Amino acid sequence: MACPPELEESLVWKLTDLGLHRHAVQHAPETPDRKQLLLWLPQPEWPEAERQQLLASLEPLAEPFGLPLPQGHWDDVADEDWSLSWKQHWQPDPVGEGLLILPAWLEVPPEHGERLVIRMDPGSAFGTGSHPTTRLCLEALEKAPPVGALVADLGCGSGVLGLAALGLGATAVVAADTDSLAVRATGDNRELNGRPADLLKVSLGSVEALQHLLEGRRADLLLCNILAPVIEALAPGFEALVAPEGRALLSGLLVDQAPRLEQVLGDLGWRVSARGSQGRWGLLEIQRR
């Protein structure tokens, strides 16, 4: 089925939560907003009635965005090695002017040889760079490279943002996530990119976990690609994480959620220094007043 960018994260989360791990979201590099969700199910265990019930269970995920769930269709395919079939649907994904998200098993295409390569294992349910909020953060990092910076990544998911920060000149990254699978995914992707553990430290937890990893220091840059209500709840802890002259990139929010979040951040002593958007998703760059 077609997969609008607004629904990607919710659909992937729901399928994973249901234990349906044989899925992929694909798009052509030149059209990142035109995605397809593919799901493989063993036919004997999933007759048509069961498949229709599954699609119906996904419909509520589209309601908060005022969108209908795109119509899905099923095709019969020959039984094959799932790992090979799954890998066919991942392609090199250029981001911004000079970044390339590359599935770990692929070689760098000659036409992208000058880009900074970030190798990822898309096997987890966490961001590989294709979601609009992740792309917004990656593009913002590229526009203002964190050269010489200590970076903190709150809600690190796959670790793609921290890996990009290191590639763009950060001296070190500390990362945390409340999901143990995300912590594992970040560690795995760190190894794929040949980054030593002391340059990208990752821990289970939230603000307190980052404070522990920072060891009394404060970060020059905070990355936080989480949903707006979670950002709002965590915002009182940002002061303890970010140096007085530092900044934070906040994404994961819808554009229409930005005004409320800006007010909350303003009350906490932050000002918005830049804004970005891609479709209905937004990004805020903030600094201390």
From Swiss-Prot:
Keywords: Cytoplasm, Methyltransferase, S-adenosyl-L-methionine, Transferase. S-adenosyl-L-methionine binds at T134, G155, D177, N225. GO terms for cellular component: cytoplasm. It catalyses: L-lysyl-[protein] + 3 S-adenosyl-L-methionine = N(6),N(6),N(6)-trimethyl-L-lysyl-[protein] + 3 S-adenosyl-L-homocysteine + 3 H(+). Its EC number is 2.1.1.-. One of its GO terms (molecular function) is protein-lysine N-methyltransferase activity. Pfam families: PrmA. GO terms for biological process: methylation. InterPro entries: Ribosomal_L11_MeTrfase_PrmA, Ribosomal_PrmA_MeTrfase, SAM-dependent_MTases_sf. SUPFAM superfamilies: S-adenosyl-L-methionine-dependent methyltransferases. It is found in: Cytoplasm. Belongs to the methyltransferase superfamily. PrmA family. Methylates ribosomal protein L11. This is Ribosomal protein L11 methyltransferase. The gene is prmA.
